[in-house]
Regions:
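Active-site capping/gating regions of soluble enzymes
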Residues: 237-271, 275-469
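N-terminal small/glycine-rich loop or linker at the start of catalytic domains
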Residues: 144-153, 232-239, 349-353
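Conserved small/polar residues in nucleotide/adenosyl-binding loops
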Residues: 472-473
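Extended, charge-enriched "interface" segments that sit outside catalytic cores
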Residues: 2-52, 58-188, 193, 199-221, ...
């Protein structure tokens, strides 16, 4: 290992999957009563089935046109690209190309299917170059379809972005709070920085967001009752990778520390989002550098957090390391447990490199087992970690509640804005359960890349839209 390499803190992620899963299952044997969890979750699932989401909701759209079908892929590709098209003629051509590849004639007779089929049949009828659509009427028809599609895309966008600005987002958050006792973690939309100019722009965006949140935060109350912010380290430095470790520590850490200071002064939490497996060790080094500063300058602040991915083969070892860090620096950490959003990329990278194993679990049920094993481990260290469980599966939530009741450890549930509303409507009937909504904020043009990437990359495995309301099993 070269002098500039990131110190190894965790075991090799490329290990035999079967051995890891067997150990996780063994750890859960005495921790969970599966039948009891199923009984708790069953009425939540039935309530969601009895009160399905509206026809225009993303869950309905994906059920009608799943992204594993040609129709679903065409709609998602169109949604991702349409708002970035500079002129109407190109938009018409794009609509013609994408919708012309799919066949929606087999749709059912639901309202959504009828509306979608009508719009798409109309667009096919007026495709540029078609006999019926070659004249002015045809072009007007095609433009009408494009306009309608744009409106539909914007409607979908509003389901996943809380607001295009922080002011809009906080206004929407106030409306949501009237319906349920929830708080929010705001995420400023955008991909990783490509230049330092990008990084400084993202830094300012995060700083402005913290200022907005701070204006409404209770400075003397419980931190968990305030809204918070999520940040992406790759957005704050353009070469966030092990080969540039020293530059990361010299430049990125001070940038993140300025955000931490502002968050601590406002009594809000700041969570570092999870990224790719090969960046995890570097993220831990950044986290430890921040903990050194927190211990000295704001030891009373308990809002520094890290998101961790259950699909990683070394997720449990990560919890052990985070626990050791928290105890070493006497700073309680927040830990957001998620399934993971980069599955396809991790699998592809391991295949391209010819690695003997994968750094993530290759089966969805293995990730589910890992998630529950990680939840058990997080609940076992309340002195060091405050767990935040992100997910929308009724069975998983019931299992977490059961394990938490045994330990008495405090925790909160989290969901993604626009997803899981039906399940959480039932879960939050218990006023003692805390929920935080992960809420993207930004322009729709930024949302679409984020949304479609997650849909296309994760639709076939454990994504947040996979079987959202049709629970066929609870374990």
């Amino acid at each position: 290992m070269s002098v500039s390499s990131t110190p190894t803190r965790l075991p090799n992620p490329y290990r035999p999957e079967g051995e890891i899963v067997s150990a996780r299952l063994l750890a859960l044997e005495s921790a969970l009563d599966w039948a009891a969890a199923a009984r708790v979750a069953a009425p939540w699932v039935q309530a969601v089935r009895d009160n399905p989401p509206p026809f225009w909701a993303m869950e309905s759209l994906l059920k009608e046109y799943p992204i594993s079908s040609a129709e679903g892929l065409a709609l998602m590709r169109l949604a991702e690209a349409l708002l970035r098209v500079p002129d109407a003629e190109t938009a018409i051509a794009l609509t013609a190309d994408q919708l012309g590849r799919a066949d929606f004639d087999g749709s059912g007779d639901k309202v959504l299917a009828r509306l979608s089929s009508t719009a798409i049949a109309m667009s096919k009828h007026f495709l540029p170059g078609a006999a019926e659509g070659s004249g002015i009427l045809g072009k007007l028809g095609a433009k009408t379809v494009v306009a309608a599609t744009l409106r539909a895309v914007q409607l979908l966008g509003r389901q996943f972005v809380l607001g295009q600005t922080m002011a809009e987002a906080m206004k929407e958050a106030d409306v949501a709070r009237k319906k349920a006792h929830v708080c929010f973690s705001y995420d400023m939309l955008g991909e990783g920085a490509r230049t330092d100019k990008d990084a400084l722009r993202y830094l300012q965006s995060y700083a402005d967001a913290i200022e907005f949140i701070a204006a409404r935060a209770n400075k003397t109350g419980t931190l968990g009752e305030n809204d918070g912010i999520s940040i992406k380290l790759s957005a704050l430095y353009p070469r966030y990778e092990d080969a540039h470790r020293m530059a990361v520590l010299d430049t990125l850490v001070p940038r993140v520390w300025t955000l931490c200071q502002a968050a601590a002064a406002a009594n809000i939490n700041l969570t570092i989002d999870a990224e790719e497996v090969d960046r995890l060790e570097l993220s831990l080094e950044v986290l430890e550098a921040l903990l050194v500063r927190v211990q000295v300058h704001c030891p009373q602040w308990t809002g520094l957090g890290l998101a961790m991915q259950a699909y990683q083969t070394r997720a449990l070892e990560l919890i052990e390391h985070l626990t050791a860090l928290a105890r070493k620096y006497q700073v309680k950490l927040m830990c957001r447990l998620v399934k993971g959003a980069y599955w396809d990329g991790e699998i592809k990278r391991a295949q391209e490199l010819g690695l003997p194993h994968y750094p993530v679990f290759t089966h969805k049920h293995h990730t589910d087992v890992s998630y529950l094993a990680c939840a058990r481990a997080l609940l076992a260290v309340p002195d060091a970690i405050f767990p935040q469980f992100a997910g929308h599966n009724a069975g998983t939530i019931a299992a977490i509640l059961q394990m938490a009741a045994k330990t008495g450890a405090p925790f909160e549930l989290q969901r993604l804005h626009g997803m899981g509303e039906g399940v959480f409507r039932e879960v939050l009937k218990n006023p003692l359960i805390r929920c935080r909504v992960y809420a993207p904020v930004g322009a729709h043009r930024d949302l679409l890349a984020y949304l479609v990437r997650r849909l296309l990359e994760n639709g076939a495995n454990s994504s947040f839209v996979h079987q959202p309301v049709s629970y066929t099993h609870l374990r």
